[in-house]
Amino acid sequence: MDFRKFLTYDYYLRKEIAFLNRIHSDQAIFAEARRRYYWTTSKKLNYRHPKDISEKVMWLTRYDRDPLKTRCADKYLVRDYVASKGLEDILIPMIGVWDHASDIDFASLPDKFVLKCNHGSGWNVICTDKSALDIEEAREKLEMWLGMKYGVDMQEIQYFDIPPKIIGEEFMPFLGGDVVDYKFHCSRGKVHSCFVAYDRSTVDPHQVCYDHYDIDWNRTDDIKEKFRPNRRLLPKPQRYEDMLKIASKLSEDFPYVRVDLYNCGDKVFFGELTFTPFSGIQSFYKQPMLDELGRFVSLEGIKKHRR
């Protein structure tokens, strides 16, 4: 890479972003997205003719402003969407919903539970023993998260207009172990393949292992080596065929969405619908799979948002 050329392009993007921010232009968000993409991939983001999956997800973030995406990025309202598809049985049971952390009566909660903010990702309090929980610290975290606007730094627009809430869910036994996340790449009801993440229980976050399986559960070699430490062959999930049907049904209304599920024994549980995996840039994939997923996703017929 020509580092001088790289820094020159970054300099002009910074100037453009500063100008657009001064005139409060929506375009500032996407100038920043171009800069972030360039820093991550060393390539210019092709909005005019997007080809690979990262380019197409970034294009969809800019131009596809379907309000259903905001509804389904909301960890509270997405439950209604899942239920509307006849899949209420895969939802983790709720124990409450609150507008403020001060509204939560911890004495009434079970010994094990999960509290999470609905308008972002990673804002969770996982309690496995209420007697050991620092309640005031938990309240402070939740209240802080409620006041934050998720996705601004990564231009994930689907999160911007979600009314912040705290939701409580039952603690599921599989959350305490080495859970495997099954994440299905989908488009308009079609399922392409399954991205998996496991070994999340390790202390070192760099030891989390990513892998990729085709729709027939054959492991592929499409993940870059550094993202798959301690790689091992995973058995086909017990309810895999049902998971494919669920992913198909939940993706019917979207040009691209990643449907995240869990399989615990004979039960399938809903995780979330993800419209911008890894903030839109799936750099752990080798280029051939990025291109293949890009061909899988069609942008035809999408009315481009203009502002």
Model-derived regions, located:
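Membrane-proximal basic amphipathic "stem/tether" segments
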Residues: 1-64
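C-terminal active-site "lid" helix and adjoining low-complexity regulatory extension at the edge
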Residues: 30, 263-307
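A conserved helix-loop-beta module that forms one wall/lid of the active-site cleft
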Residues: 49-131, 141-157
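Protein kinase-like catalytic core scaffold
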Residues: 113, 192, 257, 269-271
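A short, polar/proline- and glycine-enriched secondary-structure boundary/capping micro-motif
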Residues: 126-127, 203-212, 280-284
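Short acidic-glycine loop/turn motifs at beta-strand connectors
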Residues: 129-130, 186-190, 264-266
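Phosphate-binding site of ATP-dependent enzymes
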Residues: 136-226
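A long amphipathic alpha-helix within ATP-dependent nucleotide-binding catalytic cores
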Residues: 160-165, 208-268
